[in-house]
């Protein structure tokens, strides 16, 4: 295992500082996207919001990265895609469902019959990162 002290030191305001402009890279394991693929699940009693970065890869010409915010209560989930960049087309759609216990983050491939030829991104591969924000006010039944 790498010695993390080579790359990290204490930063200002209780942060971690990466030495020598070091960065973070992400690679798998990936999920393949079909209809209603569950990307993530979290309990609303533990977390209230999550920020996702999702990278989708369909083939050599179709790549996409999106930034998504999801905030939820026991009976409502709000999804905001606030940044999206791709090489040709949107590849995935993001939704969330919630019940009294947990939030499911759901991905669907874009299937667009209006394009010529018909565009179907079923089977695209995605990887993601998530930053979870804890619930500050406990749920009351």
Please provide the spans of the model-predicted regions:
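Hydrophobic residues embedded in beta-strands of well-ordered beta-sheets
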Residues: 16, 77-78, 101-103
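Low-complexity intrinsically disordered segments
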Residues: 85-141
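Broad, structure-driven detector of short, well-ordered beta-strand segments within folded domains
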Residues: 7, 64-72, 92-96
């Amino acid at each position: 295992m790498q010695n993390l002290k080579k790359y990290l030191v204490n930063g200002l305001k209780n942060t971690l500082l990466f030495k020598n402009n070091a960065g973070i890279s992400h690679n798998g394991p990936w999920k393949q996207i079909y209809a209603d693929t569950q990307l993530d699940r979290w309990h609303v009693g533990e977390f209230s919001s999550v920020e996702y970065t999702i990278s989708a890869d369909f083939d050599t010409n179709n790549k996409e990265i999106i930034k998504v915010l999801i905030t939820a209560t026991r009976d409502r989930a709000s999804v905001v895609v606030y940044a999206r960049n791709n090489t040709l087309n949107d590849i995935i759609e993001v939704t969330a469902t919630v019940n009294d216990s947990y939030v499911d983050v759901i991905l669907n491939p874009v299937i667009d019959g209006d394009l010529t030829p018909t565009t179907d991104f079923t089977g695209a591969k995605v990887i993601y990162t998530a930053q979870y924000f804890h619930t500050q006010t406990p749920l009351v039944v």
